[in-house]
Amino acid sequence: MKIFRNSIAIAILTTLMLALFAVFAGGMTSAGAAEVKTADVKYSAVPAGEYHLDTAHSIIGFAVRHLEINWVEGRFKDFNGTINYDDKDVTRSKVQFAAKIESIDTGVEQRNAHLRTADFFDAAKYPEMKFVSTKIEKKGKGKYILFGDLTIKDVTKPISFPFTFTGAVPDPWGGTRFGIQAETVINRRDYNINWGNALPVGGFDVGNNVTVKLQLEAVKATAK
């Protein structure tokens, strides 16, 4: 009888705990849903003019395969860039940016130092990489492709970036900003970055294809 009473007590306690958890979890779900809801941002048209990259809120990054099983990501921390935006015809806009090779950062200083050597970028001889746009094509609503010349080391080759961009927003300091997101893939060996060892299973310890990722925030230049 005592065992029976204990079983009933445990069952009641378990039911109460489950009920409380359901109520609590339901509240958390509602709060969480409200917290992650996409903001209803009222963007405005991007005004024409010259824009500079806000380097504190922009990323020129990359990702490359390691041992054909994982990705190593990195970025260039010292860079600058300019966008000359044509509000009448986006395809007539111009983009250029440059990054200091010495500023490469993959989160591991020993690897960073190796990337700066002649095995890879040879920062002492070629201190900067740069991109200069040649044209922009529209590929649908809000979709564009940016074409241009990318120079790394002693090689300049044409590449293209599919990209999207936001409308403009005012910032707290009286400026106007908009964002650009772009991504493309290049072959590092096209730019004489050839270091790497073949793996017995196939492939290389450092992948040949490099994904280049741009997350750019541009602020309108102030009138001089």
Segments from the language model and where they lie:
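N-terminal secretory signal peptides that target proteins for export/translocation
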Residues: 1-9
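Low-complexity, acidic/polar, glycine-enriched regions of mature
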Residues: 27-224
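Bacterial N-terminal signal peptides
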Residues: 11-27
